[in-house]
């Protein structure tokens, strides 16, 4: 069980397709794929980011290539957003990194057979499922290592949710939540944190029993906060909102990679998983969803409320060695400090709404921020 040198990582960003004037979601994913040269069945690319259809025609997924360094991934994230937006402009729309649409009415699922079956089976849950997440894939050596990682990182994942929170509005109203996407997403029967699996066989047994109930239609509907990827030799960290700022997306990806490496290192050393109970992790997810970084979060080691900065600092200390080995320590500190200083996307959305109380302003501001890469930094807050 030798240590992997530097793990590759990549991301999937789900972006909202919106009218740039009134902010309404537009069902134009197929047109965007056509313009960009991708299809519903072939979204492969060897030369850069690619586009893919998603559950709703009002959203588009951007997939990065696997990357070795943060610099490479930053370029992929920016290029992916630009690619999607350029194609959206060609069909009269824009794309915005909004985890929920501020203005929305329930719509049918996208047109493929699988999504249609989900729409039939899950009714209003599927019709209202227009949310945009951010998934980080981190390479693993084996399913056994991957499950060991899942078992050891599960109680840290709510911190990533808090740092990404970007969905305060839903159906035209301020929900009071920083990440209301989490509340919408958790209506799916397999969503959320899981118990310790113990082994790759244990993981497969859980999947088999869940699929045997007939509730999830297929393995693609296993919506754990983190899971083994079906198509790649990776752990897929799925808990985060899509981040309004591209640099925040990079920060979440860096933290996720370091968390995977730290968890794998613990396994190699024979350290057991934390005994934190799954219902407590659900409480941590709820607080992260409710408050983002604006209030107290549950400390992963104490299972008690602490200031968000203290909890974020605990995560950085926990993964410091992995961040140092990958050369990402300073970048991670800067990224987390920026999020704590100016807030996540939920704060900018509420500020945009507060100026004129128009939800269209939220969308137009989000469009600009999605494609603005010139944000200043502040690394001092978490330098200790």
From Swiss-Prot:
Protein name, per record: Putative glutamate--cysteine ligase 2-1
Task performed by this protein: ATP-dependent carboxylate-amine ligase which exhibits weak glutamate--cysteine ligase activity.
GO biological process: modified amino acid biosynthetic process
Record-linked PANTHER family: GLUTAMATE--CYSTEINE LIGASE 2-RELATED (PTHR36510:SF1)
UniProt superkingdom: Bacteria
Pfam families in alphabetical order: GCS2 (PF04107)
Disulphide-bridged cysteine pairs: none
Cited Gene3D superfamilies: 3.30.590.20
NCBIfam families recorded: gshA_cyan_rel, PRK13517.1-1
The reaction(s) this protein catalyses: L-cysteine + L-glutamate + ATP = gamma-L-glutamyl-L-cysteine + ADP + phosphate + H(+)
Family: Belongs to the glutamate--cysteine ligase type 2 family. YbdK subfamily.
GO molecular function: ATP binding; glutamate-cysteine ligase activity
HAMAP family hit by this protein: Glu_cys_ligase_2
EC numbers for this chain: 6.3.2.2
SUPFAM superfamilies registered for this protein in UniProt: Glutamine synthetase/guanido kinase
Keywords: ATP-binding, Ligase, Nucleotide-binding
Enzyme class: ligase
